Curated annotation (Swiss-Prot):
Pathway: Protein modification; protein glycosylation. The gene is SPY. It catalyses: L-seryl-[protein] + UDP-N-acetyl-alpha-D-glucosamine = 3-O-(N-acetyl-beta-D-glucosaminyl)-L-seryl-[protein] + UDP + H(+); L-threonyl-[protein] + UDP-N-acetyl-alpha-D-glucosamine = 3-O-(N-acetyl-beta-D-glucosaminyl)-L-threonyl-[protein] + UDP + H(+). It comes from Eustoma exaltatum subsp. russellianum (Bluebells). GO terms for biological process: gibberellic acid mediated signaling pathway; protein glycosylation. Disulfide bonds: none annotated. This is Probable UDP-N-acetylglucosamine--peptide N-acetylglucosaminyltransferase SPINDLY. The lineage of its organism: Eukaryota, Viridiplantae, Streptophyta, Embryophyta, Tracheophyta.
């Protein structure tokens, strides 16, 4: 257990949120009950999760809770259980006879039954609350329908239409119907005014324009018949075409959507909504220069369009122009101060910059502005993660998942965060991954057969998929040394912005006869189809649950054999992945850590490191000139747990005059620095002996920063990988510790492979002993530093050709098993399907055979656009969805740091709100 005394919350960061170690007051850990449960149920309803919301309402113990009865009724109503819904609304009315919401919903049920007279409940609702808009809208609809039903009685019908317009002056169908009646009565002037009013209230009301044209034609006014009010018609064409474009885009035809937007501008060249949506579409198509042009035009013609400013900020953020992004977000907020997306996005930028206090302030404001803003809680989790508070990070991710259980970002961030504190004492982390994988797999259809010839010795097609920057140090060897005659490489690169290294990799792959495909921004199901077309035999994903992963691609199971490797220290949890590549030190044969995948051990280390050409020379050990030992770590703050700090403090206290240097991005924030230092002071280490460095952007400068330390201290239970390799290559020996899980043992594998197994500790006391012992002989430390790079370069860790020979033998062994029908994932999926079938059959067997009397019909109402659909109470008002919203495809950017899991953000729905994957 981690001692509560040293779980320090950063000063100035998100006041009022408690550490998860104090579960008593935790908003996430506390069970849902009372008002909180009802609030959560309303959130679920707002996200159309009516079944889940109903389950919460069913648990409400207070039989006099009117809001619970109404909420339950609404959920039942959406499931076409009208009789049960009516009982709920009736009970609410019994408890509160003047409840406008309950009365309105009773009216809706009567109307859906065709009992328009009884639907006078709307009138009662208005009498109870004249300002209750849903009742007015629904009553207008009923009166309009009554007027139509009285077609044989013209005057009574007209009266009903006028009553509808009086109740809701903006109700266009009643105006239109008045026009029809007056046309039949040959009162064409009155009819024209009615049609014009209908068109004014609903500019896309085609029938109103058509009937207007007919009247003008019958009068002989052919010019007006062809173009009644030409300017209005052009504007309305622009509106209609823009809406049509958005409809096409949302249905998957983005090119047709763009064509409609452009056509809309032909009719109305200054229509800002069309420009705005063109900007959105071009952003989705990754044509960012065009997106910028149309977003700027949209803002020029509509200076109140905060959404356009926000979207510009998203693009500039993706292009690493953070100052310009901040300017755009601030401009959006000057227009809409409570614009939750821009508040959130500004918090994202500040988090990337390490300005944790400013980031916290913005994200908190976003949540205040929109309490159901799920991704803001996800970003809050990333903020806590970066600040080193994993417990609060996990709480924030879980809060996001409470609001949006399908949030992929929060779900995967939560799994990753749990690795930082998992010591392998139980199976909870495995179960969390397994459960996630089972749910995630159901979102995709799986391929279960392949055309790949089952010839055990034929040349194989090997597919690699990854977006990550740090992985380049470990993926270069396969791309360079594979035998392309027998192992043709296809690379699926999801890199956001190709740099010089990416271009070099591409050239090498293509020169050797391989295939390079850029898949950034392409739907994962389409990528899976590409993999099928490429006839990939073995597909290897390299990121697991880290940033911008393509596990959706793996969930489709496009290749006969699927493998996970390198980028994630645990199981993916996906039943569609056959194998996980590791070694006997990272995952011993007797490991108790469970995996969904079958473990395949390479004969040496499971990693092959290619040093950076920008590393520069090894510098002399600084203790020679300083006169004291400097310990250090460049791992991210999330890995430096309270227990790690306890051990480090013991080392520093045991080595007189020694110093500690730690480098990570959040140290540019004063509150994070002070929290870190105060924690060490509580452990007996003076803050004057600690140097904290913020992120160093340039790789050369980052590598040269190792010249400041004599001995590198590894983290646990999540050890370093890239940082350990960098440290060793720069001549800095590293102390690591053996553990029970893969994440803990990566350093064991790296050091043992290089020949430094004697620096692997068995436990915390041994860790302290080894560090103190190594620091006691500066001469030996200096000699080791001068020879360590050569020792590492000649070790199996950097022997690319030999590593690839072993890897190719492993691939061939997998293929032999496949040719014999041995497919681990298919066997696993068959077991899962059988288990699910058994559960369903058991549920059907236990389900009572009841058939309650129905009050309303099961069929949906004919007019799905009518205001009576989707009713809600005052606390849950009817929501009009703006169809011209921001709807971008996932895109991401990785922080240029040496940390293994770089920060990234994704543009999501709703005006480009950015969200972190870590």
């Amino acid at each position: 257990m981690i001692e509560k005394a040293i779980v320090a919350k950063p000063k100035g960061l998100l006041k009022g949120v408690q550490s998860s170690s104090d579960s008593k007051g935790s908003p996430v850990k506390k069970s849902l009950e009372g008002k909180e449960a009802i609030t959560y149920a309303k959130i679920l309803r707002s996200r159309n999760k009516f079944v889940d919301a109903l389950a919460i309402y069913e648990l409400e113990k207070d039989s006099k809770n009117v809001e619970a009865h109404i909420g339950k009724g609404i959920c039942l109503q959406t499931q076409n259980k009208g009789n049960l819904a009516f009982d709920c609304f009736s009970e609410a009315i019994r408890l509160d006879p003047h409840n406008a919401c309950a009365l309105t919903h009773c009216g809706i049920l009567y109307k859906d039954e065709g009992r328009l007279v009884e639907a006078a409940s709307y009138q009662k609702a208005l009498q109870a609350d004249p300002s209750y808009k849903p009742a007015a809208e629904c009553l207008a609809t009923v009166l309009n329908d009554l007027g139509t039903s009285l077609k044989g009685n013209t005057q009574e019908g007209i009266q009903k239409y006028y009553e509808a317009v009086k109740i809701d002056p903006h109700y266009a169908p009643a105006c239109y119907n008045l026009g029809v009646v007056y046309s039949e009565m040959m009162q064409y002037d009155v009819a024209l005014s009615c049609y014009e009013r209908a068109a004014t209230e609903s500019p896309t009301y085609a029938d109103a324009y058509c009937n207007t044209g007919i009247i003008y034609k019958n009068r002989g006014d052919l010019c007006l018949a062809v173009s009644p009010n030409f300017e209005i018609a052009k504007n309305n064409m622009g509106i209609a075409l823009t809406d049509l474009g958005t409809k096409e885009k949302l249905e998957g035809d983005i090119d047709q959507g763009v064509a409609y937007y452009k056509k809309a501008l032909y009719y109305n060249w200054h229509y800002s909504d069309a420009m705005y949506n063109l900007g959105v579409a071009y952003g989705e198509m990754l044509k960012f220069d065009m997106a910028i042009i149309f977003d700027e035009l949209a803002f020029h013609f509509n200076p109140h369009c905060a959404e356009a400013c926000n979207n510009l900020g998203v693009i500039y953020k993706d292009r690493d122009n953070l100052d310009k992004a901040v300017e755009c977000y601030q401009k959006a907020l000057s227009i809409k101060p409570n614009f939750s997306q821009s508040l959130n996005n500004l918090g994202v930028v500040f988090t990337v910059q390490g300005k944790m206090d400013a980031a916290a302030s913005m994200i908190e404001k976003a949540i205040v502005a929109n309490p159901t803003y799920a991704e803001a809680y996800n970003n809050l989790g990333v903020l806590y993660r970066d600040a080193g508070n994993i417990f609060l990070a996990i709480e924030a991710y879980e809060q996001c998942l409470k609001i949006d259980p399908d949030s992929r970002n929060a779900g995967q961030n939560r799994l990753l965060a749990m690795n930082y504190i998992n010591e392998g004492a139980d199976d909870r982390l495995y179960e969390a991954h397994r459960d996630w994988g089972g749910r995630f797999m159901r979102l995709y259809s799986q391929y279960t057969s392949w055309d790949n010839p089952k010839d055990p010795e034929r040349p194989l097609v090997i597919g690699y998929g990854s977006p990550d920057h740090f992985l380049s140090y470990f993926i270069e060897a396969p791309l360079l040394y594979h035998d392309y005659e027998n192992f043709k490489v296809v690379t699926y690169s999801a890199v956001v912005k190709a740099d010089a290294k990416t271009n070099r990799f591409r050239e090498r792959v293509l020169k050797k006869g391989g295939i390079w495909r850029d898949i950034y921004g392409i739907d994962e199901k389409k990528v899976a189809s590409m993999i099928r077309e490429d006839k990939v035999d073995i597909l290897i994903e390299l990121t697991g649950h880290t940033a911008n992963n393509k596990l959706g691609m793996m969930a489709c199971r496009p290749a006969p054999i699927q493998v996970t490797w390198i980028g994630y220290p645990n199981t993916t949890g996906l039943p569609t992945i056959d194998y996980r590549i590791t070694d006997s030190l990272a995952d011993p044969l007797d490991t108790k850590q469970k995996h969904v995948e079958e473990l395949i051990q390479l004969p040496a280390c499971f990693l092959c490191y290619t040093p950076s050409p920008e590393a520069g020379p090894v510098s002399p050990t600084p203790a020679l000139s300083n006169g004291f030992i400097t310990f250090g770590s460049f791992n991210n703050l999330a890995k430096i747990t309270p227990k790690v700090l306890q051990v480090w403090a013991r080392i520093l206290c045991a080595v007189s005059n020694s110093r500690l240097i730690v480098k990570c991005k959040p140290f540019c924030c004063e509150s994070v620095r002070q929290t870190f230092l105060s924690t060490l002071e509580q452990l007996g280490l003076e803050s004057t002996r600690v140097d904290l460095l913020p992120l160093i952007l340039l790789n050369h400068d980052h590598m040269q920063a190792y010249s400041l330390m004599d001995i590198s201290l590894d983290t646990f239970p999540y050890a370093g990988t890239t940082t350990t390799c960098e440290s060793l290559y720069m001549g800095v020996p590293c102390i690591t510790m053996r553990g029970l899980v893969h994440a803990h043992n990566v350093g064991v594998s790296l050091l043992s492979t290089v020949g430094l197994g004697h620096l692997v500790a068995k436990n915390e006391d041994d860790y302290v002993r080894l560090a103190v012992q190594l620091a006691s002989d500066v001469t030996a430390l200096s000699n080791l530093r001068l020879t360590l790079r050569e020792l590492m370069s000649k070790s199996p860790l950097c022997d690319g050709p030999k590593f690839i020979q072993d890897l190719e033998l492993t691939y061939r062994s997998m293929w032999h098993r496949y040719c014999k029908g041995d497919i681990p994932s298919l066997s696993r999926m068959e077991i899962l399907q059988k288990e699910e079938l058994d559960v369903v059959q058991e549920q059907l067997h236990q389900q009572p055979n009841t058939s309650p009397q129905k009050l309303v019909k099961d069929e949906p109402a004919d007019d799905a656009s009518g205001p009576e659909h989707g009713p809600a109470s005052k606390d849950n008002p009817l929501v009009l969805i703006k169809i011209n919203g921001y709807n971008t495809s996932p895109s991401s950017i990785t922080s240029p740091s040496s940390e293994e899991n770089g920060v990234s953000q994704t543009r999501m729905l709703n005006c480009g709100d950015q969200c972190f994957r870590v």
